[in-house]
Design a protein with these regions (language model features):
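Short capping segments at the starts of secondary-structure elements
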Residues: 17-19, 30-36
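Pre-recognition alpha-helix immediately N-terminal to the DNA-recognition helix
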Residues: 22-27
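A short acidic, leucine-rich amphipathic alpha-helix
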Residues: 39-45
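Short, hydrophobic-biased segments on the C-terminal half of alpha helices
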Residues: 60-61
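Glycine-centered, phosphate/nucleic-acid-interacting loop/turn motifs that mediate DNA/RNA or nucleotide
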Residues: 67
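Short beta-strand "wing" residues that participate in macromolecule-binding interfaces
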Residues: 71
Length: 73
């Protein structure tokens, strides 16, 4: 998905399309494994040095609450 497609998806789900949420969603969309929050953080921090683990956890929670992703138990 493109940046604008992801932004539209987030907005249509009632979320603000922040760069953090877009990056996390894009990562999950392109990596069809079941990564941990730490794996997502490790992959994105080089590209987005201002990201923190808290940012990743909050983005994941927002995406789950909007039913855009599902947790794996």
């Amino acid at each position: 998905m493109t940046f604008s497609e992801i932004a539209g998806l987030l907005k249509s789900s009632g979320l603000r399309a922040t760069p953090q949420r877009i990056a996390v969603y894009e990562y999950l969309d392109t990596h069809r494994t079941h990564p941990t929050a730490d794996e997502i953080f490790a992959s994105l921090v080089a590209q987005y040095p201002s990201f923190s683990r808290t940012t990743i956890y909050n983005s994941i929670r927002a995406l789950e609450d909007a039913a855009l992703i599902q947790p794996v138990m």
